[in-house]
Each structure stands twice: as structure tokens, then as C-alpha cells.
Amino acid sequence: MSSDWDTNTVIGQRVRTGGSGPRQQVARTQGQINAARRAGLVLSVDKKYASSNTKANNEGQRLTMVDRETDIVKPKKLDPSVGRAIAKGRGDKGMTQKDLATRINEKPTVINDYEAGRAIPNQQILAKMERALGVKLRGKGIGEPLGGPKKK
């Protein structure tokens, strides 16, 4: 899987000594490489190595894998018990959906989606709701009062 971007062709008979003689240069086009080969000047074709600021992007691999799968995978939805726990906790505190949304810096539609069970669960939003309502929304015991910090 080698491309022109990966190779580095150096043109010149020998490394230049002193102030005279032909300079060593890097060929940028295929035409320059061919001209140098005809003249017998190609010294080496070196592979460029990846620089330090590049990293692999796995998102394309994941999308390809999802594309090739034959069965349809539904995204995870919120359990209805979580929506009921949010509504109950909100009612106990006397808050509207808008009040809760402003308290956790989200839009009221997000709160509505979570209560209706339409939302794809986001751990950060659930954690903010847990703290604002004082009710567990994740793990075991959904709807139970949230315990304070652990004693040492």
C-alpha cells in the first residue's frame, strides 16, 4: 500500500562537497524522477515515516464494520423506569421540565426525551440529573434516593 506520498526520491550523483557540484534535490513529480533515471542520477527512494502529530482514525473502521454487518442493530434506548424516576423526582422537588433543564444546562426537549424514554442514554446528562434531583438513575436501585458522599 505504497503511494507517491509515502516515497521520497533523492536526485544527484553524490553528496555535494564544498561550494560546487550538483545539488542533491528531492523529486516532487513522477516526471522529475523519470528524467533523473534517464540521466542516471537517482540515488535513493526513501519512505516517508508518519510524523508525530498524526494518529490513526478508527471511526472509518467502525463505520465499515457496521456497514458490512447483515443484521440491523438498534441504538440503546432509555429504560421506561428511568423516565418515571426522573418525573417522580422532579415532581417531589416541585420543578418543571424547564426548571430542571436550566439547572443542568440542557434544553427542555432533552428532559422531555429522557422522561418519555426516547433518548439515547448519555452518562454525563444522567449524572447531572442525578445530582439535581437527588435520585439514582443508573445501575441498581433506579429511583432510590441518592446517598451522599461516602464516609471515610
From Swiss-Prot:
Keywords: Activator, DNA-binding, Transcription, Transcription regulation
InterPro entries: Cro/C1-type_HTH, Lambda_DNA-bd_dom_sf, MBF1_N
Region Disordered: start-end pairs: 1-32
One Pfam family linked to the record: MBF1
GO cellular component terms attached to this protein's record: cytoplasm; nucleus
Superkingdom as given in the UniProt entry: Eukaryota
DNA-binding region ranges: 97-116
GO molecular function terms listed in the Swiss-Prot or TrEMBL record: DNA binding; ribosome binding
Gene3D superfamilies in UniProt: lambda repressor-like DNA-binding domains
Cited PANTHER family: ENDOTHELIAL DIFFERENTIATION-RELATED FACTOR 1, ENDOTHELIAL DIFFERENTIATION-RELATED FACTOR 1 MULTIPROTEIN BRIDGING FACTOR 1
Protein name: Multiprotein-bridging factor 1
Source organism of this protein record: Eremothecium gossypii (strain ATCC 10895 / CBS 109.51 / FGSC 9923 / NRRL Y-1056)
